[in-house]
From Swiss-Prot:
Required during biogenesis of c-type cytochromes (cytochrome c6 and cytochrome f) at the step of heme attachment. The lineage of its organism: Bacteria, Bacillati, Cyanobacteriota, Cyanophyceae, Synechococcales. The keyword Transcription does not apply. This is Cytochrome c biogenesis protein CcsA. The keyword Calcium does not apply. Pfam families: Cytochrom_C_asm. Belongs to the CcmF/CycK/Ccl1/NrfE/CcsA family. Keywords: Cytochrome c-type biogenesis, Membrane, Thylakoid, Transmembrane, Transmembrane helix. One of its GO terms (biological process) is cytochrome complex assembly. Coiled coil: none annotated. It is found in: Cellular thylakoid membrane. GO terms for cellular component: plasma membrane-derived thylakoid membrane.
Amino acid sequence: MILDNFFKNLIYEPVSVLGLLVFYFLLINLPISLGAVFKKKSSFAVRLITILVNLLITLQLLFRWSISGHFPISNLYESLYFLAWGITLGQLLVEREYQAPIIPSIAIPIELLIVSFACFVLPEDLKSSSNLVPALRSSWLVMHVSVVMLSYAALIIGSLLSMSVLFINKNKPLQIRSSSTGIGGFKLSNSYPVNDLVESIEFSHSEELDTLSYRSILIGFVLLTLGLISGAVWANEAWGTWWSWDPKETWAFISWLFYAAYLHMRISKGWQGRKPALLASTGFLVVLVCYLGVNFLGIGLHSYGWIFG
């Protein structure tokens, strides 16, 4: 009987059912990932469930695309799941580079919060699909919005990795040899003989996480830059102006400046250790305000609607 109802709902409401399945699998994955941290050993089960979650979100978004007839990123519900998809994908890519139990343990709670917000907090009218206004019926929708959302995912992952570096080293000095290129990134090389530089240097746990954080933020910054440029071109085509300084645009520019400053301090000034980790961790709040905070204003071309109205 329960299975009959499940499959019946899956046929008639596939987007909602798949969204709930994502929530329950993340809920199962959370204690497993935390247990792996205490055991200090990466869990294959956590990675397997994360892959399943990513595939379920992919299927959910494809169903929504088929039902609505447009790329599924036009309202807050869709964009939240797209963001969760990006973070789960980023988590898997990071774990492919460096397997550490702390990586899923910091990513999965954020994924669960995002999906919970989409499932249980958003009102029904913000979950349902609707026809796009003429200005949004453009191929720029896919290019601009998807790239910006992927930049948010990469920046969030970078911030979470920096938080993990700070957490691991909360009661001890933080000395990190960085992979950041540039003037500051190569200061360490002066203290090593030439022969030693030929051999690979084994990085510590914190250094590996810091390197992954830096790379994630660099990727996110590049994507955010492309998103801002594509958005400006689209705005000029649709409304005849490159930039209107609405709340979302303003905060996106603030986010861009914030991460530009972070990368500048790491690459050119040689920032290492606790300072860049603190700055990158603060970036999580910057992205949160940029993505969700402006919706509470309920104004602007980019607002997904007044959440509690």
